[in-house]
């Protein structure tokens, strides 16, 4: 929300500038070049390991439990993108055969994997583990692996899966009790899962943790899969570091740190977000476009949130709506800098996509950006007027200011297979997108409430909720948490087949929700204060390679 201007514009303008910390990274990521000999060596060995892994997947006569565990391991190791068709075919066969199993571990794993791949397997698979009163049998308390898989499965639940509400409560209680007494690496796996469930985690973060902290220490590990995963992670990391260097140079050339010192300098954290949306090599162009967009809208956000005056922000909003470089003279000098940079960026996007005949799709992202800025301006007006809207009015405006409609649309720009129809579907705010946006809004609002309150912002989500319902801060936060849980069920339903667009275009929407869960974990604002949350993830993904 925007900061207030003074009533009399003839007087010196007082700007209640937020005291954002500088970047943690300096010029650390400014230069990186892939060592071609190393990359070629890795790629050659990966091809051989890929063939061995494919043979494992396609081997006949495997038990159901072994097949499911192999798929789960491949996915957790971050190498499943090499075998999407093979894995989908195997799971399709398992689903259509209505394969059944009697142990909790296999049943729960089967349920989660099928649901995550869009197969609407019935939760009745768990009824055999309940007693005559409909409660999970206490005899399961000693089956830690079974409980762990049940816990992970409970997070893919939809609105109709009441049994999984019980599963979550039951597995959580018993895992918390068992964790201190477990041997390594199972202890670390259980502790980590209770902190961050797999389904809501950022895929690359979860992969790095699983490779280094779990699978590498397992006695029963498959060394082919482990080496494949390590080589593949390091090879991809080279590409990611090269992209980050490219983006860092672009950011340094813009020199916003000097010219717009009121704004957060978070280009590395923005790259982490883009990497969270998609990490695979085929999305390199998409990642670079997305990180530039996130970095730029962050500057605009801080302009509204922590610097601009009412008149300035109205002029800026109007200029963005007109989207015309000739409007620049109507803006104060500091706003001209970001305005020109934004228009230049979208010209670059159009030029970049023109070679593939796709420059026309850029207009979808531009329209979403205009929407964000209009809604930023509404929030700034509320702040000036001291207006606390009803929750419904607040959310109708604040969902767009999450930027998630905008970022989801932008995430499609560099995806070469995205068609006009995919953008049209997204423009109608389908339920799965709406759910991802709601998750971002309520989690962000909960994490940033105290800071915003201290800055005098009264039209916050939590404040609106408290006033609307006559409830306490704690109760309002619980209400927002319930909204997030409901939205996760909507996302999980939206992933089930048949889907209106391919899974490729649903995954970025899912991953945007995952990113906000990770960034704001424990009600911490990991974007504004990355040292609290994101720094160790960035080091693991973009600084330290995995020892081979």
From Swiss-Prot:
The Asp-Asp-Xaa-Xaa-Asp/Glu (DDXXD/E) motif is important for the catalytic activity, presumably through binding to Mg(2+). This is 5-epi-aristolochene synthase. Belongs to the terpene synthase family. Induction: By fungal elicitor. It comes from the Eukaryota. The gene is EAS3. The lineage of its organism: Eukaryota, Viridiplantae, Streptophyta, Embryophyta, Tracheophyta. Monomer. Changing residue 274 to T: Relaxed product specificity leading to equal amounts production of 5-epi-aristolochene, 4-epi-eremophilene and premnaspirodiene with cis,trans-farnesyl diphosphate as substrate. It is found in: Cytoplasm. Changing residue 277 to L: Catalyzes the conversion of (2E,6E)-farnesyl diphosphate to (+)-5-epi-aristolochene and triggers self-alkyation of D-444 leading to enzyme inactivation. Changing residue 512 to I: Catalyzes the conversion of (2E,6E)-farnesyl diphosphate to (+)-5-epi-aristolochene and triggers self-alkyation of D-444 leading to enzyme inactivation. Catalyzes the cyclization of trans,trans-farnesyl diphosphate (FPP) to the bicyclic intermediate 5-epi-aristolochene, initial step in the conversion of FPP to the sesquiterpenoid antifungal phytoalexin capsidiol. Produces germacrene A as an enzyme-bound intermediate that is not released by the enzyme, but is further cyclized to produce the bicyclic 5-epi-aristolochene. Mediates, at low levels, the formation of 4-epi-eremophilene and premnaspirodiene from trans,trans-farnesyl diphosphate. Changing residue 516 to I: Relaxed product specificity leading to equal amounts production of 5-epi-aristolochene, 4-epi-eremophilene and premnaspirodiene with cis,trans-farnesyl diphosphate as substrate. Its cofactor is Mg(2+). Self-alkylated at Tyr-520 in the presence of (2Z,6E)-farnesyl diphosphate ((Z,E)-FPP). Self-alkylated at Asp-444 at warm temperature (42 degrees Celsius) in the presence of (2E,6E)-farnesyl diphosphate ((E,E)-FPP).
């Amino acid at each position: 929300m925007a900061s207030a201007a003074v009533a009399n514009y003839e007087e010196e303008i007082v700007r209640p500038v937020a005291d954002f910390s500088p970047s943690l990274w300096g010029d650390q990521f400014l230069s990186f070049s892939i060592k071609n000999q190393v990359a070629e060596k890795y790629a050659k060995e990966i091809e051989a390991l890929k063939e061995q892994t494919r043979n494992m997947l396609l081997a006949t006569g495997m038990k159901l439990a072994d097949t499911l565990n192999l798929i789960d391991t491949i996915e957790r190791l971050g190498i499943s993108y090499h075998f999407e068709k093979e894995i989908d075919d195997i799971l399709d066969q398992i689903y259509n055969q209505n394969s059944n199993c009697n142990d909790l571990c296999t049943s729960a794993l089967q349920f989660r994997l099928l649901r995550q791949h869009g197969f609407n397997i019935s939760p009745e698979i768990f009824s055999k583990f309940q007693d005559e009163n409909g409660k999970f049998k206490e005899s399961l308390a000693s089956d830690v692996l079974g409980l762990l898989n049940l816990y992970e499965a409970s997070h893919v639940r939809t609105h109709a899966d009441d049994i999984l509400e019980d599963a979550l409560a039951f597995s959580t209680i018993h895992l918390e009790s068992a964790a201190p007494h477990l041997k390594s690496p199972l202890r670390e796996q259980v502790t980590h899962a209770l902190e961050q469930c797999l389904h809501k985690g950022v895929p690359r973060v979860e992969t790095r943790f699983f490779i280094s902290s779990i699978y590498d220490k397992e006695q029963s590990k498959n060394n082919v899969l482990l080496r494949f995963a390590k080589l593949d992670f390091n090879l991809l990391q080279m590409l990611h570091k090269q992209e980050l260097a490219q983006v860092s140079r672009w950011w340094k050339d813009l020199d916003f740190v000097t010219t717009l010192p009121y704004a957060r300098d978070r280009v590395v954290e923005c790259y982490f977000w883009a990497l969270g949306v998609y990490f695979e090599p085929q999305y390199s162009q998409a990642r670079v476009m997305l990180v530039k967009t996130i970095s730029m809208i962050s500057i605009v956000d801080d302009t509204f949130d922590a610097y601009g005056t009412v008149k300035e922000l109205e002029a800026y909003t109007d200029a963005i709506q007109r989207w015309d470089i000739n409007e620049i003279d109507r803006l104060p000098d500091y706003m001209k800098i970001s305005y020109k940079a934004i228009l230049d960026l979208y010209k670059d996007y159009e030029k970049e996509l023109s070679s593939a005949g796709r420059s026309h799709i850029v207009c979808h992202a531009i329209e979403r950006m205009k929407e964000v800025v209009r809604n930023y301006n509404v929030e700034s007006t509320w702040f000036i007027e001291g207006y606390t809207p009803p929750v419904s009015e607040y959310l109708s405006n604040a969902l767009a200011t999450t930027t998630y409609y905008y970022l989801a649309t932008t995430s499609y720009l560099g995806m070469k297979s995205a068609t006009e129809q995919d953008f049209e579907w997204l423009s109608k705010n389908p339920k799965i997108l709406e759910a991802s946006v709601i998750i971002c809004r309520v989690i962000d609002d909960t994490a940033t409430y105290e800071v915003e309150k201290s800055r005098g912002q009264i039209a916050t989500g939590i404040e609106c909720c408290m006033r609307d319902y006559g409830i306490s801060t704690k109760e309002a936060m619980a209400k927002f948490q319930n909204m997030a849980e409901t939205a996760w069920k909507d996302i999980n339903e939206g992933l089930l087949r048949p889907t209106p667009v391919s899974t490729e275009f649903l995954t970025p929407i899912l991953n945007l929700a995952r990113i906000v869960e990770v960034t704001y974990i424990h009600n911490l604002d990991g974007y504004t204060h990355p040292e609290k949350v994101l720094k160790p993830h960035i080091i693991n993904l973009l600084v330290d390679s995995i020892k081979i």
